[in-house]
Amino acid sequence: MGEYTLRCAGCGNLLIGGAASCPLDGGLPRADYIERRFNPRKLPGIWSFIDWLPVDGWNRSTGASSVTYRSSGLAAELGLDSLYISFSGYWPERGALMRTCSFKELEAAPTMQMLRDRKAGETLVVASAGNTARAFAEVCSITDQPLILFVPVSSLDRIWTTVEPGRVLVVGVKGDYADAIKLADVLSSRSGFRAEGGARNIARRDGMGTVLLDHVRRFNSLPNHYFQAIGSGTGGIAVWEASMRIIEDGRFGERLPRLHLAQNTPCAPVYNMWHGMGSEESDFDAYGCPEGMHDDVLFNRNPPYAVPGGVRDAVISSGERIYGIDNSRAVSAQKLFEMSEGIDILPAASVAVAALVDAVESGFVENDDDILLNITGGGVKRLAEDHSRVKLKCDLTVGLRDSEDALSSIEEIFA
């Protein structure tokens, strides 16, 4: 089990009672694990990293991990000697067994386990534009954890499981992801309900951080560079935090991997803020965001950018950059990856591939650098060969203006 104290990622203040933010500077909470050495256990999936996960127990039926391998196909196309790919999805030939085909399973399993460890009997509440909802629906159905999903109506077709749905209620939101978050927050504030927590959820971040841990376990060192497509940027924060723990161990490298984070322009709040262009909601409304994006799961109006311990701190600390990738470059990158590596990927992951192509062409990486590319989702077509999918029905549809009666009805259902 991962024994830890909770501290502010900004000022280091000790946080009590599972606090979601620091009362001194509003910083993100961070787990300070008692175990300082990287010592993977002989347990399945991400549970092998249980010493650096904020859980007491583990569930054999959940916790599929990402798989890291050395690329030959894409590496040859880009002229790279040491390109490593972290694949989160379904690709059994590589040992990747995430049946919702997204790295969001890395968040769902430890979050569910942390909730069960508390034995509070609460119903989990999650807001999502698609991939997160799918992962939590799968994991909670397997473990019989009651779950309420708030999903934009436009994203409902992405919500499916490969198991019979459990105690999962799907609420279609007339609005975007930000509206789904607002409604989820209202319900989560009421007795008997527990918010998933977003970027402030240490189980979510440390679960995603296992992408970096798997690379270190397999290849015995930290990479020089790390590439990922981001929406909120929480995945980048997670890898930064995991890297600091590895460096403290002292056996696998002394320098942080340089974070190369990518967003899908023009709907790119983190990219805009990093480059000093602001992030006004009116700007995104003018572009029709998130409609028209190569993958709208990468759009988050309110990312944890400037908060202590957030995206800005992570990128400044690692000394690299944030990319803006338009649709045409993402489409080309997706074709390049699928052709060279032989597996289908989710559109969001292609934005990271495009950033890597950009970095190679611009000379930001050297041919012999160790590079870790996070393919955050893929294998949907491959999954169809082995498993059927069960589409979750929408139980009710609500908007911000007419939500109170609906939320009261939900309370009665889960009372």
Curated annotation (Swiss-Prot):
Origin: domain of life: Archaea
Modification N6-(pyridoxal phosphate)lysine occurs at: K104
Keyword tags: Coenzyme M biosynthesis, Pyridoxal phosphate, Transferase
Binding locations of pyridoxal 5'-phosphate: N131, T376
GO terms classed as biological process: coenzyme M biosynthetic process
Annotated GO MF terms: cysteate synthase activity; pyridoxal phosphate binding
Pathway: Cofactor biosynthesis; coenzyme M biosynthesis
Residue spans crossing the bilayer: none
Coiled-coil regions, chain positions: none
Catalytic activity entry: O-phospho-L-serine + sulfite + H(+) = L-cysteate + phosphate
Cofactor(s) for this UniProt protein: pyridoxal 5'-phosphate
Its EC number(s): 2.5.1.76
Signal peptide interval: none
Function description: Specifically catalyzes the beta-elimination of phosphate from L-phosphoserine and the beta-addition of sulfite to the dehydroalanine intermediate to produce L-cysteate.
Assembly description: Homotrimer.
Protein family according to the UniProt entry: Belongs to the threonine synthase family. Cysteate synthase subfamily.
Name of the protein in question: Cysteate synthase
Organism encoding this protein: Methanothrix thermoacetophila (strain DSM 6194 / JCM 14653 / NBRC 101360 / PT) (Methanosaeta thermophila)
Organism lineage string: Archaea, Methanobacteriati, Methanobacteriota, Stenosarchaea group, Methanomicrobia
